[in-house]
Swiss-Prot record:
Biological process annotations from GO: mitochondrial respiratory chain complex III assembly
Presence of the UniProt keyword GTP-binding in the record: no
Name of this chain's protein: Assembly factor cbp4
Family stated for the protein in its record: Belongs to the CBP4 family.
Source species of the chain: Aspergillus terreus (strain NIH 2624 / FGSC A1156)
Membrane topology of the entry: Single-pass membrane protein
GO cellular component: mitochondrial inner membrane
InterPro entries (UniProt xref): Cbp4
Amino acid sequence: MSRAGTWLKMLGAGIVICVGGPAFVQSIRPTDEELFKRYNPELQRRSLEEGDRRAQEFDDYVNRLKQWSKSDKSIWYAAQEQQEQKRSEAEALRNQAKDEARAQREEMRKELLGGK
């Protein structure tokens, strides 16, 4: 009987730990509203202002991950390719802006030289 009693005690203790532990954690964890109320007013205001922007950024990121996962390549390679593509586009825009500025300077020079 002592072995059966020991097993029953251990089974009971296991059930209390496996069920009671998560239930206890759930009961003491504050809700999002309680956490928000603990913020100071400036943080509350900033959180409200930036909440939509952050949610949109997260949605964009999740959509990019979904797009990358459709590729046959690894997500990391797809992300790297997209970064390289953005970098090359930014470089092309920079070069275009430089060319436009150079053309504008040349026009200004011609106007100044032609006006003298």
